[in-house]
């Protein structure tokens, strides 16, 4: 399950080998994603994509926009145009 940790400015996704993370800055209704991390042993298994799908659904539910400074987030949105409307 993906959860927002607003105090730490990140989303957290519990996985077998720890946590996958998506770091952001929030200002004026825009969430700027700066970095994502997936534990090294689990990379390449689609966990980052699963996390971003849930994260972007949450961003939409909050009525926010997105600036993808992290290349992974930018690529995810490009590959999943159903989230393109979230781009600021």
Task: Locate each region found by the language model.
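Structural motif
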Residues: 5-7, 27
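C-terminal structural segments of small proteins and small subunits
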Residues: 57-88
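Conserved acetyl-CoA pyrophosphate-binding loop and the N-cap/start of the following alpha-helix
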Residues: 42, 46-51
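A short, structured beta-strand/loop element
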Residues: 15-43
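Conserved functional loop/turn residues at catalytic and ligand-binding sites
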Residues: 37, 46, 63
């Amino acid at each position: 399950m993906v959860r927002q940790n607003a105090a730490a400015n990140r989303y957290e996704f519990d996985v077998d080998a720890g946590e996958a993370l998506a770091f952001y800055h929030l200002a004026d209704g825009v969430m700027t994603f700066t970095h994502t991390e997936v534990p090294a042993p689990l990379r390449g298994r689609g966990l980052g994509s699963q996390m971003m799908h849930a994260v972007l659904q949450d961003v939409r539910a909050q009525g926010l926009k997105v600036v993808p400074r992290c290349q992974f987030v930018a690529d995810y949105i490009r590959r999943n145009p159903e989230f393109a409307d979230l781009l600021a």
